[in-house]
Design a protein with these regions (language model features):
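Phosphate-binding site recognition
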Residues: 1-291
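A cross-kingdom feature that marks ATP-driven nucleic-acid transaction machinery
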Residues: 255, 262-389
Length: 389
């Protein structure tokens, strides 16, 4: 055996041992020998299920990418055979597989063209908490955050329960962020770990994300290809699709100046926070409370709040009593010298051939519109109407 072959074999034996222990936990005889292959493992699973009678049974394979190990083809092939040859014919069996490594699940399960091809009954993607759900989470756990602080926490951590669980209710939000990110970083390696866990060849994905982090309003496919020194071909398309499927980036049309371009924008809150404050030793020497008065904070907060709003479009629809939305995009009325008006969010509602123009501002206090600001808004509306003729 080569060194890597021995390593892969040892990994498979360890995963088979975990699988075997689970079968024992759910009633398999302790006299049953441990399987030496995934074919034997699924044969034992079938025997266990057959001995459980006719009641409804759920087979739940958690973290399938981890279970499969480096040589995943054997497990996937045997899982497909287990399902196609027997399990799919049993009306009382539900098979659930899940995994946090998004690209692996897409390539080996959802887009798999072998035994699992077109076998999925339902796909379920776990989404972060909404802003309202975060508010309820904090309320239930005796946090006394204002809505401004709840929004700020969301902009730093996203609606991810794992990150939210790091917060303590005996600290202010500023103290929590200092402790988690800066003073004693509990998630110092989280950025690298997240991408390594989600994607194979994670360094290529990180390169794309870092470049997108430098361009707050997104980049075209060609701009991304040039920045990461690759071609705008199938490999880049797959990576961009995987990033979008994971909720890390989004795509939207940018209209303006008589042209329409599709751009990719980084929208993962944790990645945005990390790249703005921690990437390449950016960690500030002052506390988070003092940092909130800096130009760096206002630049980050303004952009991130726009993303927060765009990710809560359904709640915005309800507040504005808008029906079905048919389009949503950023508009820039570019002039020849590159300057021009910008509208943060345009919501199209074709039910009444109406466009909602949204100016998004992040402010701790009520944002007052003075005469000059009002005129600037009216000028944007005029430029938008002229552009849409």
């Amino acid at each position: 055996f080569k060194k890597e072959d021995r390593s892969d074999l040892r990994c498979r034996q360890e995963q088979l041992a975990h699988f075997y222990e689970s079968l024992l936990q759910y009633g398999m005889s302790v006299e049953t020998p441990m399987p030496n292959s995934w074919r034997e493992a699924f044969r034992l699973l079938r025997q266990l299920l057959e001995n459980c009678g006719k009641r409804r049974k759920v087979v739940f394979l958690d973290e399938l990418p981890w279970l499969a190990g480096p040589q995943s083809s054997e497990l996937i092939a045997e899982l497909g055979f287990f399902w196609n040859s027997w399990a799919c014919k049993q009306r009382n069996i539900i098979l659930v597989v899940c995994g946090s490594a998004t690209s692996w699940m897409l390539d080996n399960v959802i887009r798999e063209y072998g035994g699992l091809y077109s076998r999925l009954t339902m796909k379920m993607q776990l989404h972060p908490f909404t802003l309202g759900e975060c508010e309820q989470y904090y309320k239930d756990r005796d946090f006394h955050f204002s809505r401004y602080e709840i929004a700020l926490a969301y902009m730093a951590l996203g609606g991810i329960p794992y990150y939210m669980d790091l917060l303590r209710n005996d600290r202010t939000l500023a103290e929590n962020i200092d402790q988690i990110f800066f003073k004693n970083p509990q998630i110092k390696q989280e950025f690298e770990d997240v991408y390594m866990g989600l994607f194979s060849s994670s360094e290529k994905y990180v390169d794309i994300v870092v470049e997108l982090g430098k361009h707050k309003y997104g980049m075209t496919r060609k701009e991304i290809a040039d920045a990461v020194h690759t071609t705008s071909g199938g490999g880049l398309s797959t990576m961009l699709d995987n990033l979008q499927q994971s909720g890390i980036i989004t795509t939207y049309p940018r209209l303006g100046g008589k042209r329409k371009v599709m751009v990719y924008q980084l929208v993962d809150f944790f990645s945005l926070f990390y790249l703005n404050y921690m990437h390449k030793h950016k960690t500030p020497t002052t506390g988070w409370g003092a940092l909130q008065r800096s130009p760096q904070f206002f630049a980050w907060a303004g952009l991130t709040f726009e993303i927060l709003v765009s990710q809560h479009i359904r709640q915005l629809q309800n507040a504005l009593r808008i029906g079905t939305v048919t389009g949503m995009y950023n508009w820039r009325g570019m002039t020849d010298d590159g300057d021009g008006s910008q509208i943060d969010l345009v919501i199209e509602w074709h039910g009444e051939r109406t466009d909602y123009l949204c100016e998004i501002k992040f402010s701790e206090n009520v944002f007052a519109i003075n005469a000059d600001y009002k005129q600037a808004l009216l000028d944007k509306i005029s430029a938008f109407r002229e552009d849409r003729k």
